[in-house]
Amino acid sequence: MQKTILAVAACCACGAVQAQSSVTLYGVADANVEYVNHVGAPPQASNNFNPGPANNVFRENSGGLSGSRWGLRGTEDLGGGLKSVFALEGGFNIDSGLAQQGGRLFGRQAFVGLQTNYGQLIFGRQYTSLFSTVANFVPARFATQYEPAALITGFNYREDNTVKYTGVFGPLTAMAHWTFGAGLTLPRTSPTAVTAGGNGEVPGEFRRDTGYGAALSYGAGLFRLGVGYDQWNPTIGTGSGTYKKAAVMANFGTDKANVSAGYRWGQNRDQNGALLLRDDFYWVGGNYKVLNDLTLTLEYNYQDVKSLAGSPNFTNPWQIAFIADYALSKRTDVYLTTAYAKHAGLALDSAATGYATSLALGNSYALGAGQSSMLGVALGIRHIF
């Protein structure tokens, strides 16, 4: 009898603990078939910085609306309004099964921290404050296929060794972060370009590969405003460069439609203070729910390159992109997306971005030799679990 009572008590205790904690397995599986014209190869030392001849390509990709991923996230109620939180999230190519983010197991996010009524403080690999805020103000929400996320928010939009605070106070959301070492290296993509980045946390080199930023967003009714700043100090040669981004953005939306627009200022300098890149970036677009299950998205991007490697003679690129997304259920949708870029590859991949999109995705959007435009179209399916 006593054993029975103890067993029942143990089961009740376990139930109480489980009620205070949760762990969720989640993910996205997204694949598409794509046609692109005028494709070359990203210029690198291995090909003597030559994009090669232009060709048309028909291929299968992983991630069109969302990067394919899987992850675990959870919370534990510690009492008194205090919770512990964690997330482990890895990206993968669904067309090959290979890990993304350089083969990392949890390359998209990996963090642990605490949460109270006054905000959340987390430690690990995570998104910058600027990226997290801009994501709510771009029409395609950083759709993997053609939206130039790295161009808008910086190549370092994910950083290792980061401490980040997020607080929500009514209509105001505040974020701030510091990274001890971003864990990112940008390869040379032209004879005059520099190799930038590293792991950071170097003894005696407090500034090397560090980064920081902050952002605010405010929403009232149908209108929302946001501002953000990000700085990364990558290793360049024997010193540290300074890569800066600042943005202001707005969104107006209803249940059926919304319009977003923004401006981003950017400046990259090397370890000696010499200007590597100075550019302005603009975006505008919107979403319209034609039917309960059909949403259309249109977006225009323009990059005004003031100076690249000391030269002002860079033809400014622009892109227009369209998405038709049809929901088969709450978790599965099919989509058609197309984009046209001028004076750059799709996602505005060019020397001014270090061909970040091509190198990150593994599928080139670099313009082939002698070309000035690129057209792409993709048909895909996404399942969220």
Describe the function of each predicted region.
Residues 207-327, 339-340:
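Detector for outer-membrane/organellar transmembrane beta-barrel domains
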Residues 31-37, 90-94, 127-129, 171, ...:
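Transmembrane beta-strands of outer-membrane beta-barrel pores
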Residues 1-19:
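Gram-negative bacterial Sec-dependent N-terminal signal peptides
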Residues 21-35, 53-181, 217-221:
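Outer membrane beta-barrel
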Residues 328, 369-385:
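Outer-membrane beta-barrel "beta-signal"
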Residues 54-68, 105-108, 157-161, 168, ...:
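Residues that define the transmembrane beta-barrel architecture of outer-membrane proteins
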Residues 23-31, 80, 84-88, 121, ...:
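Transmembrane beta-strands of outer-membrane beta-barrel proteins
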Residues 71-73, 111-113, 164-166, 215-217, ...:
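Outer-membrane beta-barrel architecture
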